[in-house]
Amino acid sequence: DLMKFYKACAADGIYASQGGPWYPFFQSQGYSTTGGAPKGGELILYHTQDPKDLEFQYIGEWDAFREYCQEMKDLVDAGAWSSDVLNSSDERQTGLLTGRTASMSWNLGTCLTYGKQANEEHPDWNVTMVDPNKNLSKKVNSYINNGVAINANSKNKERAMMVLNEFYTNPDVYDLAMLGIEGKHWEAVGDDQYKVIDESGYGVASNCNWGWNNCTIQREEYLENRTALDDKYESIKDAFNNNIKEDHVYDGFNFDSSNVSTQFAAVEAAIDNYYNPLINGLVDDVDASIDAMNAAMDSAGIQDILDEMNRQAAEYVAEKEEK
């Protein structure tokens, strides 16, 4: 459906987005980024929807990646986004808010924020939200994502943990960190809701509280004038929460590149020559470009990285099975 939308936008002479939907695509195939892997985890994926599949997938050898890149080239040739997108300094929301693009991909909360801004400034646009992978169960991030770590050299690790527990479990402290000062930045509505008074100087839910999110005590925002977009956001969020996938052991795995630091640095130095043009369809010949990327990655040492990753993953899985 997303591809049909992009093609329809191009046919109508409007840019569909500010680049290719690489994340929604590999997620639609059941895959996720691998923690600690090159290119922010995007170069090596794992099949998060299948807990029995313990193979890592280097995208250069993935047929689906080749097919995706060809489809992106077809979309660019059709005019689905600018051929100059890699040189643009626009932020991700710029295209939507200025009307230069018909969509924006981001997390739920950010899509709500900019969708509401677009509708307030241009009511006739009727911006809405969709989940392009609504049929897939959802991955829940582990606490190593947006979490807070205690330094291994801390002299009082237990005391540090007590502080974090206070932020995580004390409703008053939780409200302060998330919402700011009651009566200045926000006011309570009942026992479990809040209303924004003034976000200047302290953006609600946009600060350190990401490190100890706790939905059991977190207040929901009270909206006096609900919009269709608010309702859509709630329905998608509820659908997410009611469709959590089974854990994959690699959901908590994080690759340590120390033993292959030279190869890792070489891969990172070379990948941008190929990766960004490919995932945005900005190459003349997809097959030739992927072959060139693979040759560069082989020369940089991608196989050494994969071998070390498989070794660490095997140890990680064995350790988990013992517990």
Q: What feature does the model see in each segment?
A:
Residues 1-323:
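Extracytoplasmic/secretory soluble proteins
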